[in-house]
Amino acid sequence: MFKDEMRQTPNKPLPIAVVGEAILKQQAIEVRDFDDTLSQLASQMAASMVEAKGVGIAAPQVHSPLALFIMASRPNERYPDAPLMEPLVVVNPQIVLRSLQLEKGEEGCLSVPGQRFTIWRPQTIVVRYQNLAGQWQHSELTGFIARIFQHEFDHLQGITLLERSQMPEQKLMAQEGKPQA
């Protein structure tokens, strides 16, 4: 059904999965085919993200099991102070290194509508991923951009913002008011 919907409307936004839907609990599967279908999915994901005023979206959020997400930080109603970046399609991502320095930030999620949570995350990460052509890329990301990457990466692990906010380390840091070293 998902591929049929993609073929019928190549640039139309896709429906966004919300908390409680099984796809959001599943581990994403590795992308092996870097073809027009993948590019089309990325295009529709981008349209879905823009329509929902997001700064990122993961394939499971549009009912696809693939290990793929898009980051496109830009100031908008939900994130007025977001830095501006060109949209980046991230395929088969890996977080290679996480800094010990943590920072808290407010996050929302297209799959947890109307809610915001304060989440602690590593301030800097080193990542590895493939682009739409299948070429491996390496980057060091900091601040808000690192936060987006980690948030979307969580979706590929079957973790939504709601689950992340309930993890013991989040509760401990909230009680302490500072990151644990």
From Swiss-Prot:
EC number(s) per entry: 3.5.1.88
Keyword Transferase: no
Annotated keywords: Hydrolase, Iron, Metal-binding, Protein biosynthesis
Residue numbers annotated as active site: 152
Cofactor remark: Binds 1 Fe(2+) ion.
SUPFAM superfamilies (UniProt xref): Peptide deformylase
Residues the record lists as binding Fe cation: 109, 151, 155
GO biological process, one term: co-translational protein modification
Molecular-function GO terms, alphabetical: metal ion binding; peptide deformylase activity
One of the Pfam families matching this protein, by short name: Pep_deformylase
InterPro entries (alphabetical): Peptide_deformylase, Peptide_deformylase_sf
Family under the similarity heading: Belongs to the polypeptide deformylase family.
Function comment: Removes the formyl group from the N-terminal Met of newly synthesized proteins. Requires at least a dipeptide for an efficient rate of reaction. N-terminal L-methionine is a prerequisite for activity but the enzyme has broad specificity at other positions.
Name of this protein: Peptide deformylase 2
